[in-house]
Amino acid sequence: MEKKAGIVNRFSDTMPRGWFRLMFSEELKSEEIKRVNYFDQELIVFRTASGTAQVSEPYCPHLGGHLGYNGKVDGEIIKCPFHGWEFDKTGFCSRIPYGNKIPPKAKLMYWPTIESNGQILCYHDHLKNDPETSPPERLLLNTETWTPLHHLSWIVKAPLNEIIEGGVDAPHLSFIHSAIDYPKCTLEIEGEKIIANTSANYSISPDDKKGVTVKTEMQSCGPGFVRTVISSDKITAISESFLTPINYNTTEVQIFLTIKKNINSIITEHIWKSYLQNFILDFERDKLVWETKIFLETPKLCDGDGPIMAFRKWLKQFYSS
C-alpha cells in the first residue's frame, strides 16, 4: 500500500470481520445456487431442499471447479459440475461417483450463515475464525404504532469506513445538511458496541433563526449494521442500515426506514413523504462527499471535530493486520 504525505489508499489492507447482509431470503429459491460478489471475491449462496441457506467459497477442493456455474443442489448436498463430487451440510465431501477413498481434507469453505427477518447474512473473517459476536437483531415494531418499513438501496463507490464514520462527524451537519448551529457528538464505547449521540438545530423556514432541535442516536455492534433513531417534537424515525463491502472501494448500502405514526393518518402521510424525500436528498449529499474524498490516516483535527479518532480506534478492532 503506497503512502504519500499521510495519505493512504485504505483504512485497512483487509476486509472487516462481522455479520453482513447479502440478500433477501425470497431471492433464493429451494435448491438454487446464486453467484454474488462481496469482500473483493466471488461467493456462492445456495439453499438445500430442507430450506437451509448456505454461503460458500465457490471452488471445489478437488481440481478447482466453480460450483456457481452448472453446479447442482440435490436435496441436502451440493454437486460440483466438473467431476460430480458431492458435499454435505458440513462442507465435507460425502461422495465421489467414481472413487471410494475420499480425501479427508476435501471440504468446501462454508461461511457461517443465518436467515433473520427475511434476510440472509453471513459472517466474514479473512482469518477464517468462528463468529465472536451474534448477528444483528432488528427491531420488531408494532405496525399500529409505526409505518411499514420502506426499503432503500445504494451502491456507494467508497469504502465502508468512510460511510459509517459520518455518524460521528457532527460538524459536517452544518455544511452538508444545513444545520444552523455547530452540533457536537458524544461517543460511548463498550467493547464492540458503540453509541453516538448528536443534537442539531434545523430551520423549518427562511425566517426561522431558532430552528427545531433534532436528536440522533446511532448504535452499532460492528461495521455491517447501524441503527439510528432520530427524534424531535415533530417526528420520531428509525433507520436500520446494512453495509456490505463489495470491494475495497465500493459498498452496498441497504436501509430500512420507518416513522412513528401520528393520531391523524393524513398528518402521518405528510410527515412521511417529507421525511423520505429529505432522507434521500441527505444521503445523496453524503454520497457525493464519500465518493470524491480521500482517506487521511492522520487528519489535522481541531477541538470541535469531536470523537473521530476514538471512533476509528473502535472500528479498527474489526480489521485484522
Model-derived features with residue positions:
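Rieske [2Fe-2S] iron-sulfur-binding domain
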Residues: E2, V8, R21-L141
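Non-catalytic accessory segments flanking enzyme active sites
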Residues: N9, M15-P16
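A general structural signal for short secondary-structure junctions and capping/turn motifs
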Residues: F11-S12, R35, P112-I114, T244-P245, ...
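Sterically constrained small-residue positions within well-ordered secondary structures
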Residues: D13, E27, V36, F46, ...
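A short, structural micro-pattern
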Residues: P16, K107, I114-S116, A237, ...
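C-terminal catalytic domain of Rieske-type non-heme iron oxygenases
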Residues: T52, K128-S321
